[in-house]
């Protein structure tokens, strides 16, 4: 990545919809020159261009979950179990006592609480020794997060984590809106 690439990336961070002409004007390149550079950065895995959502505008709640998982095998199974969870935004392995951090969202406080305690929670995963659950108050610098709406298909009988919402007491008692990947989902996604 050189200085031209950095300028292009900086402009795309300001406005991901900037045209190749606008980018070219900033860096002094033609439309085709900028297009080639952007495509090369995308195909090389350096950048991606996608929509992010202001979760605060939707009144969603973000949470940071720290987990200590007993083994690499259990960690791999946990990563696989939640790979297609629409509420999990990011999972980070850590080099610390807690060896996994998860950034997730919930549609409301009750669902957030269920997300921390029910069968579909990260805490309930086999091999988890301990967890810490930190609801996030404010998101600073940019409120936009990459919510995985493409996973909120509302068409499955069973959630990606292999839990059935329709048999869950929290779902039945309307304390949880259900998984956005299932046909039982009652939320806004």
Predicted segments — roles?
Residues 1-189:
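A compositional/biophysical signature of low hydrophobicity enriched in polar/charged and small residues
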